[in-house]
């Protein structure tokens, strides 16, 4: 009964409109997200796949604007899961999810999770970003080592790569902090 009343009340105010319009509750949510994170901008999405798709596009766009067309590759991790769009499937490091969807998008290099040497060996003049989950949960539960994450931040800074954390499963307080990256004492891009 309470849910029906709340839905009815909201539907009488505003049911749904595009993100292109000013929506006061959305502005308040954006302010709260900025207050509790490293960022000063928010991009609202409808799903984790859409959020990761946007991260991939933004990384490539940033690199294209800064370095032109040559830097588009993103280093991702084996056993990862980033979504079911064609780009996020391509970024997913589990071959079972690739079946039936090949050819996938080019530009993703898979590295063993928590293996700094593998990441270093994968960086080349085409690399624009490193993308990973801090806790992998679809391919088994694997937690990133703190020194590994700090090392990734250092490498990303050294090579001017973006460091992207997929926090779809770990954000919003699910690990005891608002975002999981806060446990690692670093900030993503």
Predicted regions and their residues:
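Conserved N-terminal phosphate-binding loop of PLP-dependent enzymes in the Aspartate aminotransferase
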Residues: 1-189
């Amino acid at each position: 009964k309470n849910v029906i009343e709340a839905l009815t009340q909201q539907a009488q105010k505003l049911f749904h409109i595009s993100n292109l319009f000013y929506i006061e509750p959305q502005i308040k949510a954006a302010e709260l997200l900025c207050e509790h994170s490293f960022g000063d901008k928010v991009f609202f999405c409808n799903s984790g796949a859409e959020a990761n798709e946007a991260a991939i596009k933004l990384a490539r766009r940033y690199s294209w604007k800064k370095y032109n067309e040559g830097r588009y590759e993103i280093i991702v991790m084996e056993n990862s899961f980033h979504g079911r769009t064609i780009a996020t499937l391509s970024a997913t490091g589990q071959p079972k999810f690739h079946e039936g969807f090949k050819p996938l998008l080019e530009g993703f290099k898979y590295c063993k999770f928590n293996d700094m040497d593998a990441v270093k060996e994968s960086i080349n003049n085409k690399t624009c970003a490193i993308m990973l989950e801090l806790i992998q949960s679809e391919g088994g539960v694997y937690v990133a080592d703190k020194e590994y994450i700090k090392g990734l931040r250092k490498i990303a800074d050294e090579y001017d790569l973006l460091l992207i954390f997929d926090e779809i499963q770990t954000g919003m307080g699910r690990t005891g902090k608002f975002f999981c990256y806060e446990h690692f004492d670093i900030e993503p891009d």
